Regions:
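Single conserved hydrophobic/aromatic residue that forms the stacking wall/gate
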Residues: 174, 178-183
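Glycine-rich nucleotide cofactor-binding entry segment
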Residues: 1-168, 172
């Protein structure tokens, strides 16, 4: 099993209580790759190694571990976005709707933002924030590549956004990797 930091294990044990053993067993499961089809681009084909649909996203598919779908010209054209199936879950649960004002607080590289933008149907406002400027540039490229017309990419810290846009959003998406989780 993957060696995990003790602070993380303690935090998860407090949250999961009796489900901790089942949670730890998931680390023995094989790694999963996936892609999300961009229905706005209507690709004429999918990669040969594109598998079954991901149950929680109508555009998500499992992908072979050896796939080269990222080198395909259709990937560069925004016909699909490479994204782990588990990473598709937060935006699916958020289920942003057309006309809403949505803030993705830590948006890079853009998977959850593009997923939310597609769900919004190009209507409303999607603010995609990434405090680290270099990552914000990648985010901007992915938003453009996927053709999300109602997205605005910004690079600010959460307190700056709260001061500038208090109570401006209907919903907020926040996901953080362990390196960012210092709270």
């Amino acid at each position: 099993m993957t060696e995990l930091p003790q602070a993380f294990l303690s935090q998860m044990a407090a949250q999961l209580k009796g489900e901790m053993a089942a949670f730890l067993r998931t680390y023995d499961d094989p790694y999963q790759r996936g892609l999300r089809v961009n229905p706005w681009k209507r690709p004429t084909r999918l990669p040969d190694d594109c598998g079954e649909r991901v149950p929680w996203d109508e555009n998500g598919h499992y992908l072979a571990l050896t796939s080269t779908a990222g080198a395909d010209v259709l990937h560069e054209a925004g016909a699909w976005y490479l994204q782990e199936p588990s990473a598709m879950l937060p935006a699916a649960v958020l289920n942003a709707q057309p006309g809403e004002h949505v803030l993705d607080l830590c948006a890079a590289p853009g998977g959850k933002s593009t997923q939310s933008g597609l769900r919004m149907g190009g209507q409303g406002v999607l603010v995609c924030n990434e405090p680290v400027w270099e990552r914000a540039k990648i985010l901007s490229q992915n938003i453009e590549r996927m053709g999300i017309p109602n997205a605005l990419v910004v690079s600010a810290y959460p307190d700056q956004l709260a001061q500038r846009w208090p109570e401006a959003f209907d919903c907020l998406l926040y996901t953080s990797d362990a390196a960012d989780d210092k709270a």
